[in-house]
């Protein structure tokens, strides 16, 4: 183990919250104007209120951010390895970039050009979440 169990527990809590973010984000996309073939029209889309789903999605994102911040504080206060702390800091920065893109999307009425950016950043956030979890255990011997 490379950092305390409490930080690993919060990493798992953050991962669960991230799953909720991803599911609700998919639902927001599925209910919106850019969710599929333009010829299908809104009848072929998820028949839920996009605005309400966006609010649920944002609440899940805030829970994820809070869990990630708690994890980061635990890592910093426990003397965890520097690579784990750096990953946590980068992850928080990436979550905030993703948040900003989402707010821009919401306030601008989901312009088409924002969707690839939001999806790409989602991939970055998921990857760094995995990196942070992986820093919790040393799987290979250190060479230095």
Give the positions of each predicted feature.
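Polytopic transmembrane helical bundles with strong interfacial aromatic enrichment
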Residues: 1-144
